[in-house]
A protein has these predicted regions:
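Glycine/Thr-rich phosphate-binding loops that ligate phosphate moieties of nucleotide
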Residues: 1-158
Length: 158
């Protein structure tokens, strides 16, 4: 497959390689702009997986679901790929930009509008739940390709 490692300003967590450079791996004569676009979307999911895997490993917990919001969550392909990569349900917020909701909630707490966090959290509703459906073998193959591409970018060729 085609992989985009978007290290345009280096790679942050969990790689911590500020000098890494962006690269596209796996290009052939048969690859076109659709492959590069897909690789760009997939790179978002791979990077989220890298971080979630690190956090769940360190915390000793298992991720069952992830709440998401923001512009990229409109992309159904990306959300399905994210669910598959994390092997977890993706709960897409009905409110596209939850940052604004966060400001409203903080203001509400300051004014004692809500008695508890649970009461304020009820404002955030789920628009869509996306369940993982990719076979484990395919998931491992794709993610292994991503890890190899990242290792090449950061100079770990072994």
């Amino acid at each position: 497959g085609v992989y985009l490692v978007p290290a345009f300003t280096g790679l942050g967590a969990p790689w911590w390689k500020p000098d890494a450079k962006a690269a596209i791996w796996g290009m052939t004569l048969n690859a076109g702009k659709a492959h590069v676009l897909r690789a760009g979307l997939e790179s978002i999911a791979y990077q989220v997986k890298d971080l979630i895997d690190m956090m769940t490993r360190q915390a000793g917990i298992e991720l069952k679901a992830l709440r998401v919001d923001g512009g990229p969550t409109k992309n159904q392909f990306l959300m399905q790929f994210q669910a598959d990569m994390l092997h977890a349900v993706i709960n897409r917020s009905e409110i596209e930009e939850a940052s604004a909701l966060g400001a409203v909630v903080m203001n509400g707490f300051a004014r004692k509008k809500w008695a508890s966090f649970q009461e304020a959290a009820a404002m955030r509703t789920i628009d869509n739940c996306i369940a993982p459906c990719m076979e484990e073998k395919e998931l491992q193959s794709l993610y292994s390709g991503w890890r190899e591409a990242v290792k090449k970018v950061i100079g770990q060729n072994n």
